[in-house]
């Protein structure tokens, strides 16, 4: 009986415990919010904003979507959400089983999943859409109060407030300023504002300055202020350009994720160009410093596109890693400025501004050029290098730069380059002795060089150099002065301008491989040449003259460089300018991204036609006669063609027989005709471009013709083919294409150059379309805007492949026709910019 009574009491106790547990779970237990596909910095803002002990956030990996039922709300971030059909089914199943789920900001309609009622969805959207610390905190409380429906330990949620936008801000995250005047008044009241100090505007950023996760922003503001600058952080999308105009900054720092001013991109670029305001685009990495430094790529994919590639359209420079994400004591990833890189980036900004403000006579410039070993001349793609460099030096002197001892003639200057600016091979011992005697190199003692190395290079990086080449200064380009080993740095001293031949980036015989990416650390002379410019000469700016050298191809990362990447270390904090051909976009991107270069374009050699049509006139006449001849007499006409083709040697180029008794077939005649037309229409470059020597009007016209005629001809042909007006076999005939498309295109270019208005009416006439068709092409090729209304994505119109191809051909006709005069003006301006005498009082830098 006692056992039964005891068992009964136990059952009662268990029921009481279960009832208490049920009551606790229903009314008081911790509210769990699961996060799907949120970036670390977004998660950090949500977690750090939460002040309630009975609310927790947890990240849910995509491979654990089977656990969604454990959460009181599953909140997903739809942008960039890539899930399989199976994973999507798991989310839908959890929603069907009663789990509150909301995928916010879904860009894929299939991921637009929400099991909340419309009012609750609107409430969550209002909180997260106006993301700031206060709204995030109240969103968590709203979830506990209204979605999880808890009764105990509940702090009532306040209404969502509109996040501060189109404002300036400072270190106090509770303050914002609607006008520049109000902001400057605040700075003066705080004793921070400096009269006549440089103004630095900060725009963009992955992390919102009002979200709580902003230590990196605060660090940058403080660092720039401590360097004597007035800092203007702007939080705005719609009024960004208006704020910049009101501020009038000396420089803009854009934490980029796309264009700097959406909707006004071109207007912003023009405004900045007019005022010579540089845009810096430092990078924020979504990983820890250790992870980033060990990654050989640095950055890739869509994140690289938005952070590096697209900002280049605005003219952004210095894709310099400034921030990373680090774990705090709670295991939350927070954005942090990397101390060493923040210090260097602040110096970079200061050095650029100093370069703008310092008198030309005081500026010190180190100019690197490229030449082979020994008596090889200077080289640069498409450039007459020696006369161009000589013209630049004369221009610098005319602009007030301190250029001393410049030879009176170009010939004497070239001789100076060969004696004092030589590049010596590792085997040229006799030549090196002569160079020491007559070349006047800068001698850098071992102790001084190693002190520079200690300041500029990490120990691990320099250890690779010592392992490969031995202790400094090594055996190459080294000597002894007063008992101390020294590096001999080749340089030509012209006062405040110094010329340096770029040394070999590695030791070996394969010059091409050395220039285009030696896989090893550079030798001491290479390092010494760059460190001497910074520490020995004290340069204010570095210029690489001509396309191209080896700096941007030294190891390691492709982009988003770190302290273990050679270009990052050798450029240091110097403003770097690269005089680069306009015709090599691919490798110029390497220069911009891997050596932080601001590229200054020079023209390609002017284009002309080969002018060989006259040589083929007799042949083309015989071919035309062949086509007009009746079938019975065609063998005779074919042999007439063959005699001329063999006489001109065309049979060898086309690998045809030379037996003059055997006629060519119709197919072989067509091959000869196409080959002759191709040669006759071939574009070729004339003499190399010389800086300071403008194109002649005729060369400008021939270059515009070469740039314009082909795109128009091929685009119109593509439209005609799509409409069934021509066949593929007709378009394969070079003679047919020339007669029906290329020659009319050339005539059109001549007419526009002669003054015909290049407007929509002309575009429609050339393309054979109506104005409505032109407007439709614009619509098809315009990327769909991601219209967000309470997190819902709009569905873009779908177009067929034929519609897209037609639109692209129409757009190419429009682009080319409307730019014919622009090409002409650009060539005129570019060829005049670098004339040897100044045309305007402003310094060219």
Predicted regions and their residues:
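Extracellular interaction modules
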Residues: 3-10
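Ligand/cofactor-recognition surfaces for anionic moieties
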Residues: 11-832, 836, 840, 845
């Amino acid at each position: 009986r006692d056992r039964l009574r005891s068992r009964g009491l136990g059952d009662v106790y268990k029921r009481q415990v279960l009832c208490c547990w049920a009551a606790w779970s229903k009314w008081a237990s911790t509210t769990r919010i699961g996060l799907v596909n949120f970036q670390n910095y977004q998660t950090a803002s949500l977690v750090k904003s939460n002040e309630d002990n009975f609310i927790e956030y947890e990240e849910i990996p995509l491979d654990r979507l089977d656990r969604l039922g454990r959460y009181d709300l599953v909140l997903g971030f739809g942008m960039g959400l890539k899930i399989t059909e199976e994973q999507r089914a798991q989310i839908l199943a959890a929603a069907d089983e009663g789990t509150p789920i909301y995928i916010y900001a879904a860009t894929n309609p299939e991921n637009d999943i929400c099991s909340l009622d419309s009012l609750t969805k609107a409430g969550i959207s209002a909180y997260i859409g106006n993301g700031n610390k206060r709204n995030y905190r109240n969103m968590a409380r709203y979830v506990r109060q209204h979605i999880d429906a808890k009764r105990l330990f509940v702090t009532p949620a306040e209404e969502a407030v509109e996040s501060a936008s189109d404002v300036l801000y400072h270190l106090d995250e509770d303050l914002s300023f609607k006008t520049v005047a109000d902001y400057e008044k605040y700075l003066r009241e705080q004793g921070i504002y400096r009269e006549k100090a440089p103004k630095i505007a900060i725009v963009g950023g992955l992390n919102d300055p009002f979200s709580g996760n902003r230590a990196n922003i605060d660090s940058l503001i403080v660092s720039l202020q401590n360097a004597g600058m007035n800092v203007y952080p702007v939080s705005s999308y719609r009024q960004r350009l208006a704020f910049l105009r009101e501020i009038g900054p000396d420089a803009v720092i854009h934490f980029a994720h796309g264009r700097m001013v959406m909707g006004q991109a071109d207007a912003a670029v023009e405004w900045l160009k007019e005022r010579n305001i540089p845009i810096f685009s430092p990078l924020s990495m979504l990983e820890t410093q250790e992870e980033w430094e060990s990654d050989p790529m640095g950055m890739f994919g869509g994140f690289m596109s938005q952070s590096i590639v697209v900002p280049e359209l605005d003219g952004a420079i210095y894709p310099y890693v400034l921030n990373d994400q680090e774990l705090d004591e709670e295991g939350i990833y927070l954005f942090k400025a990397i101390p060493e890189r923040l210090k260097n980036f602040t110096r970079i900004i200061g050095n650029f501004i100093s370069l703008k403000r310092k008198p030309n006579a005081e500026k010190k410039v180190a100019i690197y050029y490229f030449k082979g070993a020994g008596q090889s001349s200077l080289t640069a793609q498409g450039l007459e290098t020696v006369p161009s460099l000589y013209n630049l030096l004369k221009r610098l002197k005319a602009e007030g730069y301190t250029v001393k001892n410049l030879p009176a003639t170009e010939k004497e200057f070239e001789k100076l380059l060969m004696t004092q600016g030589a590049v010596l091979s590792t085997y040229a011992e006799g030549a090196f002795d002569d160079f020491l005697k007559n070349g006047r190199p800068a001698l850098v003692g071992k102790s001084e060089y190693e002190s520079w190395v200690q300041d500029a290079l990490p120990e691990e990086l320099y250890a690779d150099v010592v392992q490969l080449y031995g202790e400094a200064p090594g055996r190459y380009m080294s000597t002894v002065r007063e008992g101390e080993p020294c590096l001999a740095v080749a340089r030509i001293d012209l006062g405040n301008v110094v010329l340096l031949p770029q040394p070999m980036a590695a030791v070996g015989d394969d010059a091409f491989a050395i220039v285009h990416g030696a896989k090893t650390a550079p030798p001491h002379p290479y390092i010494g040449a760059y460190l001497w410019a910074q520490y020995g000469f004290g340069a204010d700016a570095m210029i690489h003259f001509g396309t191209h050298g080896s700096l941007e191809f030294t190891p390691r990362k492709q982009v988003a460089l770190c302290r273990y990447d050679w270009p990052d270390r050798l450029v240091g904090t110097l403003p770097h300018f690269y005089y680069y051909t306009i015709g090599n976009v691919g490798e110029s991107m390497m220069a911009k991204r891997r050596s932080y270069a601001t590229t200054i374009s020079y023209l390609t050699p002017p284009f002309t036609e080969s002018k060989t049509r006259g040589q083929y006139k007799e042949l083309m006449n015989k071919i035309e006669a062949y086509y007009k001849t009746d079938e019975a007499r065609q063998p005779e006409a074919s042999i007439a063609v063959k005699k001329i083709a063999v006489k001109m040697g065309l049979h060898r180029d086309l690998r045809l027989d030379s037996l003059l008794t055997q006629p060519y077939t119709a197919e072989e005649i067509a091959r000869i005709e196409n080959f002759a037309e191709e040669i006759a229409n071939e574009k070729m470059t004339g003499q190399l471009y010389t800086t300071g020597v403008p194109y002649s009007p005729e060369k400008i016209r021939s270059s515009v013709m070469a740039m314009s005629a082909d795109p128009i001809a091929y685009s119109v042909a593509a439209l005609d083919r799509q409409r069934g007006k021509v066949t593929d076999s007709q378009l394969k005939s070079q003679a047919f294409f020339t007669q029906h498309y290329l020659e009319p295109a050339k005539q059109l270019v001549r007419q526009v150059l002669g003054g015909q208005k290049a407007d929509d009416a002309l575009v429609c006439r050339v393309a054979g379309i109506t104005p409505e068709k032109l407007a439709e092409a614009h619509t098809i090729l315009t990327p769909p805007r991601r219209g967000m209304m309470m997190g819902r994505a709009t569905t873009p119109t779908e177009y067929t492949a034929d519609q897209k191809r037609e639109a692209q051909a129409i757009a190419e006709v429009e682009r080319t026709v409307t730019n014919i005069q622009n090409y002409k003006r650009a060539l005129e301006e570019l060829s005049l910019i670098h004339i040897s005498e100044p045309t305007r009082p402003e310094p060219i830098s």
